[in-house]
């Protein structure tokens, strides 16, 4: 069995243009995995293997790859940097032990970098920082280091310093060993010499070395005391301190280079080995109670000898068939084994298992704790399901995905395309839990729901190219909600007595606004037997079933509290179904009396703009009914944070590019629901009525 201390499960994440995929390519080249390098700007990168990715030059799906460096096994996951795909970042962070945050030497810390960094902090993932593209015009390593401190609130520990700036960037100095690595102009990673530190950098290197040692020895009291008394620790002692501090998120070892020009990458790979944790050094995954979702107090110990515990973290359908990507936390698995899916209660036999290299695969006979593999042809597995030993059932902490906020109606151009579309969408929903589908009962239209415009654009594109389904696409629709603002006390009787056994159910109830995010809550305070206890669940079920369709415009209803306090029943004619029907009628009768209100999704918007355009950007956000929350002066421009209704954000990227001459960037994520202004609510309700009239 492989030694788990030699494993590194790492992710590479960053903003869209920071050079993340190129960095991954270089890692694969240096570790001997690929021979010709694929450049993203040629659309030929190894990791970006979907047509949509190659064309748009952005990474959409985290592709997993196994490679080796200095006797260590790296499982590398390349994650997307675009905000509409943060679900992929979140999903991959769940199965990583460490990461490399890539920042552009000229762009610095971009809005998306901050979102990904926050996710990584929440997941407590240890990271290295790689400041890339130092050969670019305007690149400044030290400015980016300052941004990491200010914008991310992180503590970068500078490990290498750049030799030369912009097009004169030739290499890096390793601050710890005081050695200079200088590359020639061939672009080949192996063509470098190790030299003495350039004379004009000696003082700077010593200054950064002293800062590094002072920060590192804080991890070891004895070493710190010795250092304060003038005794310098050895390189190995310093490395041990850096390793501990990195693991505890006290700081982030920071490197520089140019992935595209192949300069500085070897030191980053060495740092993955030296400083990022092995699977046995991170907090083990908690086990949860499947009924409540609460932690049981037990964990999935990272050990080959423990019973199997694995998490299916990604489903993909490619030209080879269905692939289930699995991170094994405990135990081992081999071809022919029968495993239990604790979410469905069903067992499956393991057929083929493969190690993935972007779009290629190597078959394996067995895998063990800490491996990331893909299993071919699993039937009933979805993202977030736990796979375990049938004799030792368990459930790993599940993945929670954000709720979609935007939808489009689609139908196949070809009448015979419906079945084909249904099968294709079914596969896509299994692959991406933040992408949902439903059928409009009245119109029969298929409604696709997602995290943003780009997210849905790409889904439509995949349907067209991968599955050959041409679609007619409707305008994007916002996921509005309804709620009530006033308490109502009311009574409703359902009576149907026309010979034979009839139906009778009378309920007296109060409906009032619930706490925010409470959904639907029900309680019964009936005293005596006016509504027998066995009918209470039917009353609750009746009310709850009506929450999907509000009375204003048919949108789902949020945050309503119902109290059943009295009623009446008939010894012969009363039944659970009679009380359920009574509750449904009561909902329709009383919600309009409770001052219903339309709610709209509010997005947390983060805009980066050059300083000379900030007035235009803020004016535009105000026109979009935005609330400006914060403004921060950066070194390269201004960051504006605002809460803006989603309905006002369609096509925003085009407007922002026009306003800022193509230099502005933004990210947005769902924040909360808030009441619509009356004029907006009236317009939305009128549009819904008009649409319904046409059906």
From Swiss-Prot:
Keyword GTP-binding: yes
SMART domains: EFG_C (SM00838), EFG_IV (SM00889)
GO molecular function (one): GTPase activity
Tagged with keyword Cytoplasm: yes
Segments forming domain tr-type G: 5-280
Keywords of this entry: Cytoplasm, Elongation factor, GTP-binding, Nucleotide-binding, Protein biosynthesis
One GO term of the biological process aspect: ribosome disassembly
Xref: Pfam families: EFG_C, EFG_III, EFG_IV, GTP_EFTU, GTP_EFTU_D2
Subcellular localization(s) per the UniProt record: Cytoplasm
Signal sequence extent: none
Superkingdom of origin organism: Bacteria
Primary location: cytoplasm
InterPro entries hit by this protein: EFG_II, EFG_III, EFG_III/V, EFG_IV, EFG_V, EFG_V-like, EFTu-like_2, G_TR_CS
Residues reported to bind GTP: 14-21, 78-82, 132-135
Any single Gene Ontology cellular-component annotation: cytoplasm
Its biological purpose: Catalyzes the GTP-dependent ribosomal translocation step during translation elongation. During this step, the ribosome changes from the pre-translocational (PRE) to the post-translocational (POST) state as the newly formed A-site-bound peptidyl-tRNA and P-site-bound deacylated tRNA move to the P and E sites, respectively. Catalyzes the coordinated movement of the two tRNA molecules, the mRNA and conformational changes in the ribosome.
Classification via HAMAP family: EF_G_EF_2_B (MF_00054_B)
PANTHER family xrefs: ELONGATION FACTOR G 1 (PTHR43261:SF5), TRANSLATION ELONGATION FACTOR G-RELATED (PTHR43261)
Family: Belongs to the TRAFAC class translation factor GTPase superfamily. Classic translation factor GTPase family. EF-G/EF-2 subfamily.
Xref: NCBIfam families: EF-G (TIGR00484), PRK12740.1-5 (NF009381), small_GTP (TIGR00231)
Protein name listed in UniProt: Elongation factor G 2
